[in-house]
Amino acid sequence: MVRFVPWNVPLYRRLETMAVAIYAMVLPVCLIMAFNLIVIPLFWGIAIPYLVWMFYFDTKHESGGRRVSLVRNSILWRYFRDYFPISLIINSNYDPKKNYIFAYHPHGIISIGAFCNFATNANNIDEKLPGLKVHLLTLESNFKIPFLRDVLMSFGMSSVSKKSCENILNSGAGESICLVVGGAEESLDARPGLNEITLKKRKGFIKLALVNGASLVPVYSFGENDIYDQVPNPRGSLVRKIQTKIKDLTGIAPPLFMGRGIFNYDFGLLPVRHKIVTVVGEPIDIPKIKSPTDQVIEHYHQIYVEALQNLFDKHKNSCADKETGNLKIN
């Protein structure tokens, strides 16, 4: 039986749900607007110059976006934060003269914790990391969608391309990036109670840190995998093979997930209410090596994996649900 939302839900909870619904509607609304812009002749006078500018002249998505404080500090994101709720724990001090790569785990279905903590100022990251400007990175393909690209850049978000990463890390003291290391593949392992990440073969971010002399910071979000359920898709199953094939062809993973609705608790595309605790570890200083060997990359990869495991073990009992399993690294 479907459980509907009662009529006497407090106003603040309705506002929290509204904030999450607005977040969920950004992509479809932008797609509808882009479609209308292109197919309706009335709008071509706007569409042609906008698309030319977007594809041939505007490269801000490769250099840190166009951060708008009004957007990042909006009260909307405070309600968004409180819906789950989402909290941020920072375990160290960071040198504002250095550049950092914050490596975020796990991906979850849509990296809610990464967005709230690194793209908005809902948990006061700007005050907790004084002197640092952290840019959350996302797929290059997201910046090919009219209007969506402008929304993303207003949060200071940028492309996850190599060029974008290096542009930001070399643009001045304190300029830093947040990478969701597991990517699309990891989203297929996101389900409640599991802490399964894709990391063993992910070494590009280690090389990026070495080439640019940026310090690495492990970040783990307890609860990121608990806000959506997902159709069973064990490795080797037909469902997983189809998902992997689509991911290989498009770069986008299609997890078959289910959350809740605006007016019910049992089905829909909104995430369920479940606390997310994002823990930021201590920085790992990395030497600047323009042409690191595979052995050097492997060495620092092992150091990073150990640091992430220690971070998880240290905070698991205090930040995660009792039924949460151990960290599994694929």
UniProtKB/Swiss-Prot annotation:
Pfam families: DAGAT. GO terms for molecular function: diacylglycerol O-acyltransferase activity; retinol O-fatty-acyltransferase activity. This is Diacylglycerol O-acyltransferase 2. One of its GO terms (biological process) is monoacylglycerol biosynthetic process. Keywords: Acyltransferase, Endoplasmic reticulum, Glycerol metabolism, Lipid biosynthesis, Lipid metabolism, Membrane, Transferase, Transmembrane, Transmembrane helix. Catalyzes the terminal and only committed step in triacylglycerol synthesis by using diacylglycerol and fatty acyl CoA as substrates. Required for storage lipid synthesis. It is found in: Endoplasmic reticulum membrane. Belongs to the diacylglycerol acyltransferase family. Pathway: Glycerolipid metabolism; triacylglycerol biosynthesis. The chain crosses the membrane at residues 15-35, 37-57. Disulfide bonds: none annotated. Its EC number is 2.3.1.20, 2.3.1.76. It catalyses: an acyl-CoA + a 1,2-diacyl-sn-glycerol = a triacyl-sn-glycerol + CoA; all-trans-retinol + an acyl-CoA = an all-trans-retinyl ester + CoA; 2-(9Z-octadecenoyl)-glycerol + (9Z)-octadecenoyl-CoA = 1,2-di-(9Z-octadecenoyl)-sn-glycerol + CoA; 1,2-di-(9Z-octadecenoyl)-sn-glycerol + (9Z)-octadecenoyl-CoA = 1,2,3-tri-(9Z-octadecenoyl)-glycerol + CoA. It is an enzyme of class 2 (transferase). It comes from the Eukaryota. PANTHER family: ACYLTRANSFERASE, DIACYLGLYCEROL O-ACYLTRANSFERASE. It is a multi-pass membrane protein. One of its GO terms (cellular component) is perinuclear endoplasmic reticulum membrane.
